[in-house]
UniProtKB/Swiss-Prot annotation:
AMP binds at T31, R36, E57, L58, V59, G86, Y87, P88, R89, Q93, R156, R167. ATP binds at G10, A11, G12, K13, G14, T15, R128, T137, F138, Q195. Residues 30-59 are annotated as: NMP. It comes from Streptococcus sanguinis (strain SK36). Monomer. This is Adenylate kinase. It catalyses: AMP + ATP = 2 ADP. One of its GO terms (cellular component) is cytoplasm.
Length: 212
């Protein structure tokens, strides 16, 4: 079974990816892991990627696509299937993935799209606060401190609402064309992410069991 998982930051994609890999015994192919392995093994694409990373530059699409192709060419993929997580990030990468799968005689069986309302995600992701003296982490809504005084707490730049909103907006702008692309192929299965973690996985499990 060859799968792709998608979802906005904070939607629980990483948690559900781990559950899918564990339950269905497919290879978990995440962008970070692929890059680390390719660089450690000094593959052709890994060496190229490292040259950009060492200069503090973004790795070009053709190198990222090449690293994905190297990983999908490995023997375990035909035996176990895979779950792609964190790739493709752009519609151009999605088209490159289509071409790679065709060249390797592979095909996607399904795209799991974890849907959560962006406003809920904004509240979830921008609520983290840190106590100035102890460094303890709390959440304004889900785990508020008993003795909250605003001056005793601070937020990291990454957690500020305007920063989180920008990140969500970028992810929506990049992700929606990819979802539309796979929806036209009849591959997308929408899963409601605004529920208990185990309920989300039950919904995914039901979809994937029917795909097998």
């Amino acid at each position: 079974m060859n799968l792709l998982i998608m979802g906005l930051p904070g939607a629980g994609k990483g948690t559900q990816a781990a559950k899918i890999v564990d339950h269905f015994n497919v290879a978990h192919i995440s962008t970070g892991d692929m890059f680390r392995a390719a660089i450690a093994n000094q593959t052709e694409m890994g060496v190229l990627a490292k040259s950009y990373i060492d200069k503090g530059e973004l790795v070009p699409d053709e190198v990222t696509n090449g690293i994905v192709k190297e990983r999908l060419s490995q023997n375990d993929i035909k035996e176990t299937g895979f779950l792609l997580d964190g790739y493709p990030r752009t519609i151009e990468q999605a088209h490159a993935l289509d071409q790679t799968l065709t060249e390797l005689d592979l095909a996607l069986d399904g795209v799991i799209n974890i849907e959560v309302d962006p406003n809920s995600l904004l509240e979830r992701l921008s609520g983290r606060i840190i106590h100035r003296e102890t460094g303890e982490t709390f959440h304004k809504v889900f785990n508020p401190p008993a003795d909250y005084k605003e001056e005793d707490y601070y937020q990291r730049e990454d957690d500020k609402p305007e920063t989180v909103k920008r990140r969500l907006d970028v992810n929506i702008a990049q992700g929606q064309p990819i979802i539309d692309h796979y929806r036209r192929k009849g591959l997308v299965h929408d899963i409601q992410g605004n529920q208990d973690i185990n309920d989300v996985f039950s919904a995914i499990e039901k979809v994937l069991t029917n795909l097998k």
